[in-house]
Protein backbone atom coordinates (compact mmCIF):
# COMPACT_ATOMS: atom_id res chain seq x y z
CA UNK A 1 0.00 0.00 0.00
CA UNK A 2 1.26 3.54 -0.67
CA UNK A 3 2.56 5.58 2.24
CA UNK A 4 -0.18 8.17 1.67
CA UNK A 5 -2.79 5.63 2.76
CA UNK A 6 -0.86 5.01 5.97
CA UNK A 7 -0.69 8.69 6.87
CA UNK A 8 -4.15 9.71 5.65
CA UNK A 9 -5.97 7.02 7.67
CA UNK A 10 -3.62 5.29 10.10
CA UNK A 11 -6.52 3.43 11.70
CA UNK A 12 -7.91 1.95 8.47
CA UNK A 13 -4.41 1.11 7.25
CA UNK A 14 -3.58 -0.70 10.50
CA UNK A 15 -6.86 -2.60 10.61
CA UNK A 16 -6.24 -3.78 7.03
CA UNK A 17 -2.99 -5.42 8.14
CA UNK A 18 -0.84 -4.13 5.30
CA UNK A 19 2.76 -2.97 5.33
CA UNK A 20 3.51 0.29 3.50
CA UNK A 21 5.48 0.12 0.26
CA UNK A 22 7.80 2.74 1.77
CA UNK A 23 8.57 2.54 5.48
CA UNK A 24 9.93 6.07 5.97
CA UNK A 25 9.81 9.41 4.28
CA UNK A 26 8.86 13.07 4.61
CA UNK A 27 5.45 14.70 4.99
CA UNK A 28 3.95 18.07 5.91
CA UNK A 29 5.68 19.65 2.92
CA UNK A 30 9.03 18.25 4.01
CA UNK A 31 8.82 19.67 7.54
CA UNK A 32 8.34 16.28 9.21
CA UNK A 33 10.08 12.94 8.83
CA UNK A 34 8.10 9.76 9.52
CA UNK A 35 8.99 6.10 9.99
CA UNK A 36 6.73 3.03 10.15
CA UNK A 37 8.13 0.74 12.85
CA UNK A 38 5.65 -2.11 12.53
CA UNK A 39 1.96 -2.81 12.99
CA UNK A 40 0.42 0.20 14.75
CA UNK A 41 3.78 1.92 15.37
CA UNK A 42 4.58 5.23 13.70
CA UNK A 43 7.36 7.68 14.60
CA UNK A 44 7.59 11.35 13.64
CA UNK A 45 10.34 13.93 14.01
CA UNK A 46 10.70 17.53 12.82
CA UNK A 47 13.10 17.82 9.90
CA UNK A 48 14.66 20.99 11.34
CA UNK A 49 17.95 20.42 13.15
CA UNK A 50 17.15 21.77 16.63
CA UNK A 51 17.05 18.34 18.26
CA UNK A 52 18.62 19.29 21.58
CA UNK A 53 15.54 21.15 22.82
CA UNK A 54 12.95 18.63 21.68
CA UNK A 55 10.72 16.72 24.03
CA UNK A 56 10.01 13.06 23.32
CA UNK A 57 6.30 12.22 23.46
CA UNK A 58 4.71 8.77 23.20
CA UNK A 59 0.96 8.84 22.66
CA UNK A 60 -0.85 5.50 22.70
CA UNK A 61 -4.37 4.15 22.37
CA UNK A 62 -5.95 0.78 21.74
CA UNK A 63 -4.07 -1.11 24.44
CA UNK A 64 -7.59 -2.45 24.93
CA UNK A 65 -8.88 -3.19 21.45
CA UNK A 66 -12.49 -2.12 22.01
CA UNK A 67 -11.66 1.36 23.37
CA UNK A 68 -12.18 3.03 20.05
CA UNK A 69 -12.54 6.79 20.58
CA UNK A 70 -8.89 7.46 21.49
CA UNK A 71 -7.81 5.28 18.55
CA UNK A 72 -9.88 7.45 16.20
CA UNK A 73 -8.40 10.61 17.75
CA UNK A 74 -4.85 9.34 17.24
CA UNK A 75 -5.57 8.49 13.61
CA UNK A 76 -6.79 12.07 13.06
CA UNK A 77 -3.69 13.41 14.83
CA UNK A 78 -1.49 11.47 12.38
CA UNK A 79 -3.50 12.79 9.43
CA UNK A 80 -3.18 16.40 10.56
CA UNK A 81 0.56 16.11 11.28
CA UNK A 82 1.19 14.56 7.87
CA UNK A 83 -0.84 17.23 6.09
CA UNK A 84 0.91 20.07 7.90
CA UNK A 85 -2.34 21.14 9.57
CA UNK A 86 -0.73 20.57 12.99
CA UNK A 87 2.90 21.60 13.53
CA UNK A 88 5.26 19.13 15.18
CA UNK A 89 7.56 20.40 17.93
CA UNK A 90 8.75 17.12 19.46
CA UNK A 91 9.91 13.62 18.72
CA UNK A 92 6.68 11.62 18.60
CA UNK A 93 5.86 7.93 18.75
CA UNK A 94 2.24 7.04 17.98
CA UNK A 95 1.18 3.59 19.16
CA UNK A 96 -1.98 1.59 18.49
CA UNK A 97 -1.63 -1.08 21.15
CA UNK A 98 -3.53 -4.33 20.76
CA UNK A 99 -4.05 -4.42 17.01
CA UNK A 100 -5.42 -8.01 16.76
CA UNK A 101 -8.01 -7.18 19.44
CA UNK A 102 -8.90 -3.97 17.58
CA UNK A 103 -9.56 -6.02 14.45
CA UNK A 104 -11.72 -8.43 16.46
CA UNK A 105 -13.60 -5.65 18.27
CA UNK A 106 -12.56 -7.16 21.61
CA UNK A 107 -10.87 -5.82 24.73
CA UNK A 108 -8.19 -8.51 24.35
CA UNK A 109 -7.83 -12.00 22.85
CA UNK A 110 -6.25 -14.04 25.68
CA UNK A 111 -4.97 -11.67 28.38
CA UNK A 112 -5.34 -8.03 29.32
CA UNK A 113 -2.39 -6.42 27.54
CA UNK A 114 -2.28 -3.66 30.14
CA UNK A 115 -1.32 -6.22 32.80
CA UNK A 116 1.60 -7.69 30.85
CA UNK A 117 4.25 -4.97 30.93
CA UNK A 118 7.47 -4.72 32.97
CA UNK A 119 8.26 -8.26 31.87
CA UNK A 120 5.08 -9.92 33.08
CA UNK A 121 4.43 -11.14 29.53
CA UNK A 122 7.14 -13.75 30.15
CA UNK A 123 4.81 -15.45 32.64
CA UNK A 124 2.19 -16.14 29.95
CA UNK A 125 4.25 -17.19 26.91
CA UNK A 126 1.27 -18.88 25.23
CA UNK A 127 -0.83 -15.70 25.32
CA UNK A 128 -1.42 -13.96 22.02
CA UNK A 129 -0.87 -10.67 23.87
CA UNK A 130 2.59 -11.61 25.19
CA UNK A 131 4.62 -10.88 22.02
CA UNK A 132 2.85 -7.55 21.59
CA UNK A 133 3.69 -6.47 25.15
CA UNK A 134 7.35 -7.30 24.51
CA UNK A 135 7.26 -5.42 21.19
CA UNK A 136 5.71 -2.32 22.76
CA UNK A 137 8.26 -2.38 25.58
CA UNK A 138 11.11 -2.58 23.07
CA UNK A 139 9.68 0.22 20.92
CA UNK A 140 9.24 2.53 23.92
CA UNK A 141 12.69 1.74 25.29
CA UNK A 142 14.35 2.44 21.93
CA UNK A 143 12.36 5.64 21.43
CA UNK A 144 13.25 7.12 24.80
CA UNK A 145 16.85 5.87 24.66
CA UNK A 146 17.31 8.09 21.60
CA UNK A 147 15.90 11.16 23.38
CA UNK A 148 18.21 14.17 23.73
CA UNK A 149 19.88 14.25 27.14
CA UNK A 150 17.94 16.27 29.68
CA UNK A 151 14.90 16.76 27.46
CA UNK A 152 11.33 16.15 28.61
CA UNK A 153 9.80 12.70 28.19
CA UNK A 154 6.05 12.12 28.17
CA UNK A 155 3.74 9.15 27.71
CA UNK A 156 -0.01 9.68 27.39
CA UNK A 157 -1.87 6.34 27.23
CA UNK A 158 -5.51 6.95 26.27
CA UNK A 159 -8.36 4.61 27.20
CA UNK A 160 -12.11 4.54 27.65
CA UNK A 161 -13.81 2.77 30.55
CA UNK A 162 -16.20 -0.17 30.67
CA UNK A 163 -18.51 1.54 33.17
CA UNK A 164 -19.80 5.01 34.02
CA UNK A 165 -17.88 7.21 36.43
CA UNK A 166 -18.70 9.92 38.97
CA UNK A 167 -15.86 11.76 37.20
CA UNK A 168 -16.41 11.01 33.51
CA UNK A 169 -12.79 11.65 32.57
CA UNK A 170 -9.98 10.80 34.96
CA UNK A 171 -6.31 9.87 34.98
CA UNK A 172 -4.18 7.28 36.71
CA UNK A 173 -0.55 8.02 37.57
CA UNK A 174 1.83 5.08 38.07
CA UNK A 175 3.75 4.66 41.31
CA UNK A 176 7.32 5.91 40.94
CA UNK A 177 8.29 6.54 44.56
CA UNK A 178 8.20 10.32 44.08
CA UNK A 179 5.34 12.85 44.20
CA UNK A 180 3.61 13.69 40.92
CA UNK A 181 5.07 16.63 39.04
CA UNK A 182 3.38 19.98 38.70
CA UNK A 183 3.87 19.73 34.94
CA UNK A 184 1.75 16.58 34.76
CA UNK A 185 -0.99 17.79 37.11
CA UNK A 186 -1.26 21.11 35.27
CA UNK A 187 -1.35 19.32 31.91
CA UNK A 188 -4.20 17.16 33.21
CA UNK A 189 -6.00 20.30 34.34
CA UNK A 190 -5.55 21.76 30.86
CA UNK A 191 -7.05 18.54 29.46
CA UNK A 192 -10.07 19.13 31.75
CA UNK A 193 -9.44 15.87 33.58
CA UNK A 194 -11.63 16.01 36.69
CA UNK A 195 -9.84 13.51 38.90
CA UNK A 196 -6.43 11.86 39.23
CA UNK A 197 -5.79 8.52 40.88
CA UNK A 198 -2.32 7.97 42.38
CA UNK A 199 -1.11 4.39 42.52
CA UNK A 200 0.87 3.44 45.62
CA UNK A 201 2.35 0.16 44.38
CA UNK A 202 4.17 -0.91 41.27
CA UNK A 203 2.03 -2.29 38.47
CA UNK A 204 2.29 -3.93 35.08
CA UNK A 205 0.62 -1.26 32.97
CA UNK A 206 2.07 0.37 29.89
CA UNK A 207 2.36 3.76 31.62
CA UNK A 208 4.07 2.18 34.62
CA UNK A 209 6.64 0.61 32.30
CA UNK A 210 7.48 3.90 30.59
CA UNK A 211 7.60 5.78 33.90
CA UNK A 212 9.85 3.28 35.65
CA UNK A 213 12.04 2.04 32.82
CA UNK A 214 12.10 5.03 30.46
CA UNK A 215 11.90 7.98 32.86
CA UNK A 216 8.75 9.36 31.26
CA UNK A 217 6.09 11.55 32.82
CA UNK A 218 3.40 8.97 32.20
CA UNK A 219 -0.32 8.71 32.75
CA UNK A 220 -3.27 6.56 31.80
CA UNK A 221 -6.28 8.61 30.70
CA UNK A 222 -9.82 7.26 31.02
CA UNK A 223 -11.87 9.41 28.69
CA UNK A 224 -15.42 8.07 28.70
CA UNK A 225 -17.30 4.92 27.71
CA UNK A 226 -16.38 2.04 25.41
CA UNK A 227 -18.22 2.21 22.07
CA UNK A 228 -17.74 0.54 18.65
CA UNK A 229 -15.73 2.24 15.89
CA UNK A 230 -17.71 5.03 14.25
CA UNK A 231 -20.18 5.41 17.14
CA UNK A 232 -18.21 7.87 19.27
CA UNK A 233 -19.20 11.47 19.93
CA UNK A 234 -15.67 12.80 19.61
CA UNK A 235 -16.76 16.26 20.79
CA UNK A 236 -16.85 14.80 24.32
CA UNK A 237 -13.11 14.15 24.02
CA UNK A 238 -12.21 17.59 22.66
CA UNK A 239 -10.44 19.01 25.76
CA UNK A 240 -8.14 15.99 26.08
CA UNK A 241 -7.53 15.95 22.33
CA UNK A 242 -6.61 19.65 22.38
CA UNK A 243 -4.20 19.09 25.28
CA UNK A 244 -2.48 16.22 23.47
CA UNK A 245 -2.19 18.31 20.32
CA UNK A 246 -0.70 21.21 22.28
CA UNK A 247 1.82 18.87 23.88
CA UNK A 248 2.84 17.60 20.44
CA UNK A 249 2.89 21.01 18.74
CA UNK A 250 4.48 23.02 21.54
CA UNK A 251 1.34 25.07 22.18
CA UNK A 252 0.61 26.80 25.46
CA UNK A 253 -1.91 25.73 28.08
CA UNK A 254 -5.32 27.36 27.87
CA UNK A 255 -6.28 30.45 29.85
CA UNK A 256 -9.89 30.67 31.00
CA UNK A 257 -12.22 33.65 30.64
CA UNK A 258 -11.04 35.12 33.94
CA UNK A 259 -7.42 35.11 32.82
CA UNK A 260 -6.44 32.13 34.97
CA UNK A 261 -5.52 28.58 34.17
CA UNK A 262 -7.98 25.68 34.33
CA UNK A 263 -8.69 24.18 37.72
CA UNK A 264 -6.42 21.40 38.89
CA UNK A 265 -8.07 17.99 39.17
CA UNK A 266 -9.09 16.38 42.42
CA UNK A 267 -6.55 13.82 43.57
CA UNK A 268 -7.28 10.40 45.03
CA UNK A 269 -4.75 7.92 46.39
CA UNK A 270 -5.09 4.14 46.28
CA UNK A 271 -5.22 2.72 49.81
CA UNK A 272 -6.13 -0.89 49.05
CA UNK A 273 -7.41 -3.26 46.42
CA UNK A 274 -9.75 -6.22 46.21
CA UNK A 275 -7.89 -9.19 44.74
CA UNK A 276 -9.88 -12.08 43.34
CA UNK A 277 -8.80 -15.19 45.23
CA UNK A 278 -11.19 -17.61 43.55
CA UNK A 279 -14.32 -17.83 41.42
CA UNK A 280 -16.32 -17.61 44.67
CA UNK A 281 -15.62 -13.87 44.90
CA UNK A 282 -18.70 -11.75 45.64
CA UNK A 283 -18.69 -7.97 45.21
CA UNK A 284 -21.48 -6.38 47.23
CA UNK A 285 -21.96 -3.45 44.86
CA UNK A 286 -24.41 -2.99 42.00
CA UNK A 287 -23.29 -4.48 38.70
CA UNK A 288 -23.46 -1.02 37.13
CA UNK A 289 -21.92 0.91 40.05
CA UNK A 290 -20.03 3.95 38.77
CA UNK A 291 -16.30 4.38 39.23
CA UNK A 292 -15.53 6.60 42.25
CA UNK A 293 -18.79 5.72 44.03
CA UNK A 294 -18.32 6.45 47.75
CA UNK A 295 -18.93 4.03 50.62
CA UNK A 296 -18.98 4.76 54.35
CA UNK A 297 -16.89 3.22 57.11
CA UNK A 298 -18.03 -0.30 58.02
CA UNK A 299 -19.47 -1.18 54.60
CA UNK A 300 -18.59 -4.71 53.48
CA UNK A 301 -17.68 -4.54 49.80
CA UNK A 302 -16.38 -8.02 49.00
CA UNK A 303 -16.08 -11.57 50.26
CA UNK A 304 -14.10 -14.49 48.85
CA UNK A 305 -13.94 -17.51 51.14
CA UNK A 306 -12.31 -16.33 54.38
CA UNK A 307 -11.37 -12.99 52.81
CA UNK A 308 -13.58 -9.96 53.42
CA UNK A 309 -13.07 -6.31 52.50
CA UNK A 310 -14.60 -3.75 54.87
CA UNK A 311 -14.30 0.03 54.50
CA UNK A 312 -12.04 1.32 57.29
CA UNK A 313 -11.85 5.05 56.42
CA UNK A 314 -14.68 7.54 56.87
CA UNK A 315 -15.18 7.35 53.11
CA UNK A 316 -13.63 5.16 50.45
CA UNK A 317 -14.42 5.17 46.75
CA UNK A 318 -14.32 2.12 44.50
CA UNK A 319 -12.70 2.23 41.07
CA UNK A 320 -12.66 -0.51 38.40
CA UNK A 321 -14.84 -3.05 40.23
CA UNK A 322 -14.81 -6.19 38.09
CA UNK A 323 -15.59 -9.61 39.62
CA UNK A 324 -15.12 -11.36 36.26
CA UNK A 325 -11.32 -11.00 36.15
CA UNK A 326 -9.18 -14.11 36.40
CA UNK A 327 -8.24 -15.31 39.93
CA UNK A 328 -5.14 -13.52 41.18
CA UNK A 329 -6.00 -10.26 39.43
CA UNK A 330 -7.35 -7.00 40.82
CA UNK A 331 -11.14 -6.93 41.13
CA UNK A 332 -11.34 -3.35 42.38
CA UNK A 333 -9.34 -0.42 43.76
CA UNK A 334 -10.21 1.58 46.89
CA UNK A 335 -9.18 5.24 46.98
CA UNK A 336 -9.45 8.22 49.32
CA UNK A 337 -9.36 11.96 48.58
CA UNK A 338 -5.86 13.40 49.07
CA UNK A 339 -6.20 16.55 46.96
CA UNK A 340 -4.94 19.07 49.52
CA UNK A 341 -1.75 17.28 50.55
CA UNK A 342 -0.90 16.19 47.00
CA UNK A 343 -1.22 19.67 45.49
CA UNK A 344 0.85 21.08 48.36
CA UNK A 345 3.66 18.61 47.61
CA UNK A 346 3.88 19.19 43.85
CA UNK A 347 7.38 19.66 42.49
Swiss-Prot record:
Binding locations of Zn(2+): 64, 67, 159
InterPro entries per the UniProt record, alphabetical: AspA/AstE_fam, AstE_AspA_cat, Aste_AspA_hybrid_dom, SuccinylGlu_desuccinylase
Gene3D superfamilies: Zn peptidases (3.40.630.10)
A Pfam family annotated for this UniProt entry: AstE_AspA_cat
GO molecular function, a single term: succinylglutamate desuccinylase activity
HAMAP family: Arg_catab_AstE
Function: Transforms N(2)-succinylglutamate into succinate and glutamate.
Name this polypeptide is given: Succinylglutamate desuccinylase
Gene that this sequence comes from: astE
Amino acid sequence: MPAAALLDDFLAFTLAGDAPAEQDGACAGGAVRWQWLGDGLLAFEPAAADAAARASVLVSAGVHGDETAPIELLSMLVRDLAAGALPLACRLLVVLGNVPAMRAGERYLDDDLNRLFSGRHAQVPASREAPRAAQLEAAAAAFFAAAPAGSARWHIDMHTAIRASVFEQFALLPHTGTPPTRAMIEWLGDARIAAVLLHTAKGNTYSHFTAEHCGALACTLELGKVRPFGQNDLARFAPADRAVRKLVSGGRAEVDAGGGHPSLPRVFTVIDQITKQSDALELFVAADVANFTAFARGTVLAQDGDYRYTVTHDEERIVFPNPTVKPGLRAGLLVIDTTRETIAALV
